[in-house]
């Protein structure tokens, strides 16, 4: 049941991975914003990291512009195959998507942002069976713009498609896509400190993964899940404006439905 504490509700919002299906989150944040639902913390992994920073910056109504800009390109399967209008994912994020982010608005926000990436262990640790480790980059208030950009690139740095042996280096440490260590960044903080944890997942696989890993939903914290009610029209590596519009609309409608059902629960 939704909480009613007579005080401001403390909420965490988690945006999952999903590659190009992440356009769904543009609709999610639009519905949350129109309902006036506020969050103290927003976490994101992979494409969800871009959703997290746009949401925290209050760029709700500009975020689809970044998705639309991608439609001037196709997704290259590898940097070796890049052309002027076909680019690998890291290039697209760095040069097409992130320039839409208003760093000043994000710095002025009182929302704490958590970005998940997967740290690559040394070869010696790999021999011991340790390949990746979850790592969070956190931002609130003043920060260096390049540090945020590096964190997002690390979180979105899918293996192979950005280069077979390539990775994103930050301070000498190598990182790959945050989804490799968990599709949903609910482990960014202790969820027990929140009244509500909202989880938006462009694929139901992420939610199933949470319960496989033993997510405890039995405490006082309420967990609210937003997942596609039907299959998203966009494939993970597909760039298509009409399908992006449909994915946005589905995210908008699904989130409105979740909000409405909660209002009915409270009478």
Residue ranges of model-derived segments:
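Patatin-like phospholipase
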Residues: 1-45, 53-267
């Amino acid at each position: 049941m939704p909480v009613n504490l007579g005080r401001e509700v403390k909420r965490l919002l988690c945006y999952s991975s999903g590659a190009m299906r992440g356009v769904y989150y543009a609709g999610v944040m639009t519905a949350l914003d129109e309902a006036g639902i506020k969050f103290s913390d927003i976490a994101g992994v992979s494409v969800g990291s871009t959703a997290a920073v746009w949401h925290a910056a209050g760029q709700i109504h500009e975020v689809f512009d970044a998705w639309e800009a991608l439609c001037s390109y196709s997704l290259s399967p590898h940097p070796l195959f890049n052309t002027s209008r076909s680019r690998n994912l890291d290039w697209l994020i760095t040069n097409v998507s992130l320039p839409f982010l208003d760093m000043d608005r994000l710095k002025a926000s009182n929302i704490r942002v958590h970005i998940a990436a997967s740290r690559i262990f040394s070869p010696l640790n790999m021999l011991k069976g340790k390949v990746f480790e979850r790592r969070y980059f956190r931002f609130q208030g003043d920060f260096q713009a390049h540090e945020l950009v590096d964190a997002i690139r690390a979180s979105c740095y899918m293996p192979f498609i950005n280069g077979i042996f390539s990775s994103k280096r930050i301070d000498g440490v190598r990182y790959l896509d945050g989804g490799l260590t968990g599709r949903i960044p609910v482990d960014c903080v202790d969820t027990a400190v929140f009244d509500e944890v909202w989880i938006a997942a462009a694929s139901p696989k992420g939610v199933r993964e949470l319960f496989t890993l033993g997510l405890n939903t039995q405490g006082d914290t309420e967990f609210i899940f937003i997942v596609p009610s039907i299959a998203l029209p966009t494939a993970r590596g597909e760039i298509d404006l009409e399908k992006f519009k449909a994915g946005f609309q589905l995210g908008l409608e699904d989130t409105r439905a979740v909000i409405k059902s909660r209002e009915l629960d409270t009478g």
